[in-house]
Amino acid sequence: MKRLLLSTAVVSLILCSQAQAFFEEEGRCQKRNLKGQWVSYQAEVKANPHTGVCKFSIENGKVEGTCDFSLTDDQGNPLTGLQFTGEATVQEDCSAELTMDFTPFGRPFVSTFHLQLHRNKKSFVGRWENAFGALGTANGVKL
């Protein structure tokens, strides 16, 4: 009987420690959680109301992608296929920062995103801003 109780206690301790480790890891975010292909939807709500869809990849904190906006340039051409590069970081609490720098591709603006990853680490919500005084909301999903 003592052996049965002892073996049951040992198995219970092992299972409890594994469950605790799983749930501790589940709640924290790491750089690897950003890696992959994402699609983001934005809505500017302050200076020049418009929407945007951006598709991008993140690898080792480096961001590359393109955006389509519901705006036109001075000649009336739609602002679609705009390329950008940037950087992304994430904290253990799953708050993240991401930049979209359009300047290397002839567009004079950088957008900064302040995001919160969902606990499944496959979606986010947040806000963004740029140097022109634009302010908006953002949400996205990992593909």
Question: Each PLM stretch: what is its role?
Answer:
Residues 39-43, 67-69, 97-104, 125-129:
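Short beta-strand segments that buttress and anchor functional surface loops
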Residues 22-28, 80-93, 123, 127-143:
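Edge beta-strand at a domain terminus
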Residues 90-119:
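Acidic, glycine-rich flexible loop segments
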Residues 48-95:
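N-terminal glycine/threonine-rich, aromatic-flanked beta-hairpin/loop signature
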Residues 2-47, 135-143:
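Amphipathic/hydrophobic helical signal segments and adjacent flexible N-terminal regions
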Residues 72-76, 105-108, 132-136:
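A short local loop/turn or secondary-structure capping micro-motif enriched for an aromatic residue
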Residues 49-51, 108-110, 130:
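Repeated polar recognition positions within modular binding domains
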Residues 46-48, 64, 106, 123-125, ...:
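Short loop/beta submotifs within extracellular cysteine-rich repeat domains
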